[in-house]
UniProtKB/Swiss-Prot annotation:
It comes from the Eukaryota. Residues 1-24 form the signal peptide. It is found in: Secreted. Shared alpha chain of the active heterodimeric glycoprotein hormones thyrotropin/thyroid stimulating hormone/TSH, lutropin/luteinizing hormone/LH, follitropin/follicle stimulating hormone/FSH and choriogonadotropin/CG. These hormones bind specific receptors on target cells that in turn activate downstream signaling pathways. The keyword Signal applies. The gene is CGA. One of its GO terms (biological process) is regulation of signaling receptor activity. Heterodimer. The active hormones thyrotropin, lutropin, follitropin and choriogonadotropin are heterodimers composed of CGA, a common alpha chain described here and a unique beta chain which confers their biological specificity to the hormones: TSHB for thyrotropin, LHB for lutropin, FSHB for follitropin and choriogonadotropin subunit beta/CGB for choriogonadotropin. This is Glycoprotein hormones alpha chain. One of its GO terms (cellular component) is extracellular space. It holds the Pfam family Hormone_6. Belongs to the glycoprotein hormones subunit alpha family. Glycans are attached at residues 80, 106. SUPFAM superfamilies: Cystine-knot cytokines.
């Protein structure tokens, strides 16, 4: 019986150490690894050999926080949570024609800025 208690104690200690290490990382440390930084990446659909087309792709930040009481009083429809986010957008671009008559923006530089067009 003492034999099994020792194994149970070792398992519990190992589990608690693992959970301590897991909770010591800042929030989002593991999820950010899947999300690349905001920069121009080649658009395979519009690119041709020798004439690549680049589009801004990547992640920026978003956050939500409680709406301040002073701000709530000015809202027509009061909301308890306020959110803000930035999107990966082109800082500079050139317009080019592809496939004969399709006008496409070739992004040359990207940055995180206000989101104007939200993707669903």
């Amino acid at each position: 019986m003492d034999y099994y208690r020792k194994y149970a104690a070792v398992i519990l200690v190992t589990l608690s150490v693992f959970l301590h290490i897991l909770h010591s990382f800042p929030d989002g440390e593991f999820t950010m690894q899947d999300c690349p930084e905001c920069k121009p990446r080649e658009n395979k659909f519009f690119s041709k050999p020798g004439a690549p087309i680049y589009q801004c792709m990547g992640c920026c930040f978003s956050r939500a926080y409680p709406t301040p009481v002073r701000s709530k009083k000015t809202m027509l429809v009061q909301k308890n949570v306020t959110s803000e986010s930035t999107c990966c957008v082109a800082k500079s671009l050139t317009r080019v024609m592809v496939m004969g008559s399709v006008r496409v923006e070739n992004h040359t530089e990207c940055h995180c800025s206000t989101c104007y067009y939200h993707k669903f």
